[in-house]
Design a protein with these regions (language model features):
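Bacterial N-terminal signal peptides
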Residues: 2, 6-14
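Flexible coil segments in periplasmic/lumen-exposed cytochrome c-class electron-transfer proteins
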Residues: 19-22, 32-33, 41, 77-155
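Conserved beta-strand positions that form and line the central face of beta-propeller blades
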Residues: 54-56, 78
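Short microdomains enriched in Cys/His and/or Lys/Arg
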Residues: 57-71
Length: 155
């Protein structure tokens, strides 16, 4: 039984460590895109630059919907698009930039830093696997900041 228990612990540890690079790359893409500028480090959103951002922890959007939102943003809101090819053809909601001529209020906003396909998938996987439906934890806080900080106190 001791051997089986040790094997179980080893397999579980390996599985947890295998997810660490995915978490790190997804978090890196989240930071590169400056998602925390609106959605905050914790992913709960709230007031920020340009208004209140959606809580990524409480969103009901599925993976494909999240990919579309990250790639294309949300016209008429402060959610920018992160795919540098967005709105150059009709891949985003069947619309092109020309559809917004004379309508600057609803024109999609460019991200300050574009993400490539791999980064977009990584940030969406990070949202789905590490934020969506989960509470903010001290462990997550320490992973986000790379060390314990005052933000982690009280979690």
């Amino acid at each position: 039984i001791k051997i089986l228990l040790n094997m179980f612990v080893y397999i579980l540890s390996y599985a947890l460590l295998a997810d660490a690079p995915k978490f790190d790359y997804g978090l890196s893409a989240y930071k590169k895109g400056n998602c925390m500028g609106c959605h905050k480090w914790h992913g709960d959103g709230g007031p920020g630059y340009g208004g209140a951002a959606l809580s990524l922890r409480e969103t009901g959007l599925d993976r494909e919907q999240l990919i579309t939102i990250v790639e294309c943003g949300r016209p008429g809101t402060n959610m920018p698009f992160f795919d540098k090819k967005a709105y150059k053809d009709d891949r985003c909601f069947g619309m092109k930039f020309s559809d917004f001529e004379g309508d600057d209020k609803n024109r999609p906003l460019n991200a300050k830093s574009y993400l490539n396909k791999r980064q977009i998938n990584a940030v969406v996987d990070f949202i789905v696997n590490d934020l969506q439906g989960k509470k903010v934890s001290k462990e997550y806080c320490i992973k986000f900041f790379g060390k314990p900080t005052r933000s982690c106190d009280g979690l």
